[in-house]
Amino acid sequence: LTRGAFMTSYRTFGKSVPRRDGIDKVTGRAKYTADITLPGMLWGKSLRSPYSHARILSIDTTAAENVPGVYAVLTGNDVRGILYGRRLRDVPVLAWDHVRFVGERVAAVAAENEDIAQAALDLIKIEYEELPSLLDPLEAMKTEAPLIHPDMLNYVGFPETPERPSNVFVQDIYGKGD
């Protein structure tokens, strides 16, 4: 077979590429981190905000703390000021004064197993004051719009610190050639 004949007879497009882990995944033999249980291991679960924008008025964790098998219950007050993010550290580990999106973490539980952790989460009582949501980017850019990130001057990771908090941030990086 000549090189030219081989190249015209062999086709890669339109063919399935077998995955090395495919059989294990479809048969249920594959192991994921959620499948691993170690002696003495604790399970963690988070309680998340049902509101897109709200002030946290109170959090009562008393009942959750008294569930047998619960080792710890944390709220934003326990980790106040600790922020994370890939480049700009602007996401609280747990929200403490207000929430900015549906699903933002508000409390966390560590327990002996997943069911106990969930039962404890279900007992946490949170009182919110729902605030107006900014759903339109043009409305969010107006001077009188409520700030999405009122603490932004304390964030780590800005290429240059803004002079005052704002919902508008512009950064341009240009390059030319090599």
Where in the sequence are the language-model features?
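Flexible, low-hydrophobicity surface segments
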Residues: T2-G177
